Each structure stands twice: as C-alpha cells, then as structure tokens.
C-alpha cells in the first residue's frame, strides 16, 4: 500500500485524531457483538504506547432526527473499550463545543478520549454524511495535524469524519486494521496465488453486478449461490417456482453467463420449501428446476459436492454472501458445506468479505479457520469491484 501508515509518523505528545469503526449492534443498551471494537485495539494501543493522545471518532447506526439519538450514544462503547484497554476512556458525550475542547486539551500522553456518535451531526443538514467542509475543518482543528483512519467499514464513504478531516491535516495515515484489510482484499484480487476462486451469494444480482464482472476477469472460477441463483436460472428458462427473482435483471444475468466462458458455476440443485416462513414441507430438488408452489432457500447436496470439487486445490478464495437462509437451521447446510470446503484446502488464503458471510462464519463456528474476515461489507464489495475507496484515496502518499 503506497500510503503512509501509523508507523510512519511521530506520535509522542501529539493529539492524534483516529477514525475507528465502532458501529456495533446494541440491544437495550448492551453490545451484542464487540468484534469491531476488538479489531481497533492494535492501532489504539500502538498510539498510546508511543505516547500519543488518542481522540477517537465513530458513528453508530443512523441518526436522522433528534429522536433517533436515544439508544445511539457511544456511552456503552466507551465503557467496553475502557475494560478492554484496562484504562479510563474520557467520554464527554458531545460532538463539538467548549466541553469537548476542554476535555481534549486536558488529555495527557497515553490517554484516550471518545467523541460522541459522529452521526449526531446528521440531525442538522446531514453534516457528517454529506462531508460538510466546516465540520471536517473543525474536527481536524482538535488535533495536532495527524489523522489515523482505521475504519475500513466506512472507507467507501466520503464523510466529514474521514475524508473531511483528512483534507485538513498535515498527515492522514492508515491504521493497522485498514492496512490489513487493503492488503488482504486487494492482494487477493490483484495478485492472487492461483487457482483463485471467488464465491458470491446473497439474494440480489443487482448488488453484485460490478463484483461479478470484475471477478470474471480476475478469478479462475466464480461460484454463485444464494437467492441470486434463481435470476440466473430464469434467464436460462429454468423453472424457479416462487423463488426470489429480479425480473429487471434477467438480461444482465444472461449477458454475464455469455461473457463468462464457463467460469461462472451455478448450483445444480436446491433445498426447496413450500413457504418462506411457516412452511410445512422441505425437500431437495431433483435438478435445477424448483417445483411449482415452492421456493429455493439454499443450495442442495449435489451443489455442495460440485462446489467442493470446484474448490479443490484453490490457493486463494474470496467469499461474499451466504448460500442460503443460513439463519434457519433447515437452510444452512449449503453455507456450512461451502465454508468447510474452503478451509480444508491446504495452504489456502481464505478471505470473507464482511457482512452476512462474516456473521455466518461467526455464528456457525468457522470464523477462526479463515485467513481474514473483513470488518466492512460495503467497502470490501467496492474493493472487489475494483473501485477506488474515498477514505483510502484521501490518505497521504508515502
């Protein structure tokens, strides 16, 4: 990566602004998954060990109006972070103003402060999400000219708390998490050890058109599963029953199949049910066709075997999107089968592109078997598409 990283700058005695991704799920004010906080620890610890004063920025959920602020405070995150670091985290509970400035100016070397949810600034004219130049300038003024971006999850967005601050500091650098994310995903796509197999699931073809197009050029094989299978089926005239389909994407699916030259591998059977919820019958289809009155909710056993074979000997695998409705035990065999087929390959570099696939690996107990699990669904998708991420582009060149 030809950008400066946190190791390239002198941090001692400096007020260091850090964009982290603490957008964690909360239930009744309790954090239900703290992965993103844990992922940010190496960068935060490095800054304070070097004698820097870490000033952290993050968003949490969406905040459009005053009423949305309830339940979207970063207070529970500050408490969780303090426990993980084993030291106090200063939390003024505001995003700007005299109270925040005083708290920052009172920091000593090695201390940590967390600014309140940056999206609180969206209540008045979406200042954070629309990268209001004055807000970026103000937040940049709170530090000593160094900004560390460690929030891969928002790197595909141009917000005041990443691109806005970057534009107003002397040095904008990458944190360890951002550096690793880029290294794993970009390297996998641009300079993979071959054979390179990509696996794409999820419900919509429309979400993945750019990714499929880019990966058809880069990968040796592209395996398709999940709900988008049925748009590809219908494009070929295969019966899909009541399965999910994007009628307006049939031509796109047809064009992708023609362009693929056999690289695109589709499931050969499905697990079908007579309803999405409250079904009374679940069975495997004979072949590709889904029965009338039924809908496909997972890939079937023949497809799992076919994908297992397609993955044999793979050295690089990028996976984005589950094979079926994995949250339901009746329809998780496809996702489990594909995960197991990936991780059993000797010496494979296996990467999960965030989002639902990451949740599937964690919930189904396979997370520790993968080389890398991305913290950013949307950002990793854009990297897989070959796009330039604004949050990354805004960093200082080496």
UniProtKB/Swiss-Prot annotation:
It is an enzyme of class 2 (transferase). GO terms for biological process: gluconeogenesis; glycolytic process. Signal peptide: none annotated. It catalyses: (2R)-3-phosphoglycerate + ATP = (2R)-3-phospho-glyceroyl phosphate + ADP. One of its GO terms (molecular function) is ATP binding. Belongs to the phosphoglycerate kinase family. PANTHER family: PHOSPHOGLYCERATE KINASE, PHOSPHOGLYCERATE KINASE 1, CHLOROPLASTIC-RELATED. This is Phosphoglycerate kinase. It comes from Streptococcus pneumoniae (strain Hungary19A-6). The gene is pgk.
């Amino acid at each position: 990566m030809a950008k400066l990283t946190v190791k390239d700058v002198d941090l001692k005695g400096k007020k260091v602004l850090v964009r982290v991704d603490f957008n964690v799920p909360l239930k009744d004010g309790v954090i239900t998954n703290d992965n993103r906080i844990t992922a940010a620890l190496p960068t935060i610890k490095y800054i304070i060990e070097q004698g820097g004063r870490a000033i952290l920025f993050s968003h949490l959920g969406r905040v459009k109006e005053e009423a949305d602020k309830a339940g979207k405070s970063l207070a529970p995150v500050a408490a969780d972070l303090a426990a993980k670091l084993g030291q106090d985290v200063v939390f003024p509970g505001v995003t700007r103003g005299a109270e925040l400035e005083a708290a920052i100016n009172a920091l000593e070397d090695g201390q940590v402060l967390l600014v309140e949810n940056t999206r609180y600034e969206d209540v008045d004219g979406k200042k954070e999400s629309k990268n209001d130049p004055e807000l970026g300038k103000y937040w940049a003024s709170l530090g000593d000219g160094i900004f560390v971006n460690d929030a891969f999850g928002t790197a595909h967005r141009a917000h005041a708390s990443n691109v806005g601050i970057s534009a107003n500091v002397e040095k904008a650098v990458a944190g360890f998490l951002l550096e690793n994310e880029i290294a794993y995903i970009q390297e996998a796509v641009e300079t993979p050890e071959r054979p390179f197999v990509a696996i794409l699931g999820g419900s919509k073809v429309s979400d993945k058109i750019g990714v499929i197009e880019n990966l058809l050029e880069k990968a040796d094989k592209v395996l398709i599963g999940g709900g988008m299978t049925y748009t590809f089926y219908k494009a070929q005239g295969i019966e899909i029953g009541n399965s999910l389909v994007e009628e307006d994407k049939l031509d796109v699916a047809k064009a992708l199949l023609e362009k693929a030259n056999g690289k695109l591998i589709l499931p050969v059977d499905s697990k079908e049910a007579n309803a999405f919820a409250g079904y009374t019958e679940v069975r495997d289809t004979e072949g590709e066709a889904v029965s009338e009155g039924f809908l496909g909710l997972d890939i079937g056993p023949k497809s799992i075997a076919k994908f297992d074979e397609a993955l044999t000997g793979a050295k690089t695998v990028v996976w984005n999107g589950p094979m079926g409705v994995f949250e339901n035990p009746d329809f998780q065999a496809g996702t489990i089968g594909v995960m197991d087929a990936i991780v059993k390959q000797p010496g494979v570099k296996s990467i999960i592109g965030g989002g639902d696939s990451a949740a599937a690996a964690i919930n189904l107990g396979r997370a520790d078997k993968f080389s890398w699990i991305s913290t950013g669904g949307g950002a990793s998708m854009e990297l897989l598409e070959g796009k330039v991420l604004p949050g990354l582009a805004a960093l200082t060149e080496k």
